[in-house]
Curated annotation (Swiss-Prot):
One of its GO terms (biological process) is late endosome to vacuole transport via multivesicular body sorting pathway. A component of the endosomal sorting required for transport complex III (ESCRT-III). Residues 182-215 are annotated as: Disordered. Keywords: Coiled coil, Cytoplasm, Endosome, Membrane. Residues 205-215 have a biased composition (Basic and acidic residues). It comes from the Eukaryota. Residues 14-85, 149-173 form a coiled coil. Pfam families: Snf7. The keyword Disulfide bond does not apply. InterPro entries: Snf7_fam. This is Vacuolar-sorting protein SNF7. The keyword Cytoplasm applies. GO terms for cellular component: cytoplasmic side of plasma membrane; cytosol; ESCRT III complex; multivesicular body. It comes from Yarrowia lipolytica (strain CLIB 122 / E 150).
Length: 215
């Protein structure tokens, strides 16, 4: 159809391919019909080749004409098929190009506000934040520093040990007589002179108690 300005209306490649295929269908029917007619003329020539040579000769002439027509039709079919193949390839290339154009357009839109400097800056900031996060995690997991003076603790422990030993020795001074507990001042006064052997035993007992309390 001609437009208002005398130009032909552009036809979609797909519509053109459909039209060509329809034309091939028509030509194939004509080609099949010609093949049938060719075979009929050949059969007629064979039938009269011995009885009526003139009729047989005319049949062969018709056969030759039909064969030329069939060759022309077949050539047209082949040409149309080639055109269809070319159009299909071109249309496929066109659709591929359109898809690539859309993809490039989308990528351009995505990268519109992006450049290598911004990417490098973002990566640097990300690395800094990761390093900061690791430092914070390390600081949180680090145990508290020793808030006590070890020497002061040792002195306090020694004083406590001495106090405990003295208490134990005081309790050890109580003895039982006839089932009744008495204190040292209830016992008869001991002689001023203590045998050396008894002093050694007491010293040994005292050291033993100290060792037990130190455990």
């Amino acid at each position: 159809m001609w437009g208002f300005f005398g130009g032909a209306k552009k036809q979609d490649p797909k519509d053109t391919i459909i039209s060509l295929r329809q034309q091939i269908i028509v030509l194939n029917k004509k080609n099949d019909n010609l093949i049938v007619q060719i075979q009929e003329q050949e059969n007629l020539a064979r039938k009269h080749v011995t009885t009526n040579k003139l009729m047989a000769k005319n049949a062969l002439k018709k056969k030759k004409n039909l064969e030329k027509q069939q060759e022309t039709v077949q050539g047209s079919i082949d040409s149309l098929q080639t055109s269809i193949n070319t159009l299909e390839t071109a249309n496929l290339n066109l659709e591929t190009m359109k898809a690539m154009q859309e993809g490039a357009k989308a990528m351009k839109q995505i990268h519109g506000n992006m450049n290598i400097d911004k990417v490098d800056k973002i990566m640097d900031e990300t690395r800094d934040q990761v390093a900061l996060s690791e430092e914070v995690s390390e600081a949180i997991s680090r145990p508290y520093a020793n808030a006590y003076d070890d020497e002061e603790l040792e002195d306090e422990l020694e004083a406590l040990e001495q106090e405990t030993l003295e208490g134990e020795l005081t309790n050890a001074g109580h003895v039982k007589q006839d089932g009744v507990q008495v204190t040292p001042h209830d016992l008869p006064a001991a002689p001023n002179q203590v045998p050396a052997e008894e002093e050694d035993d007491e010293e040994e007992e005292l050291r033993r108690l100290q060792r037990e309390m130190a455990l």
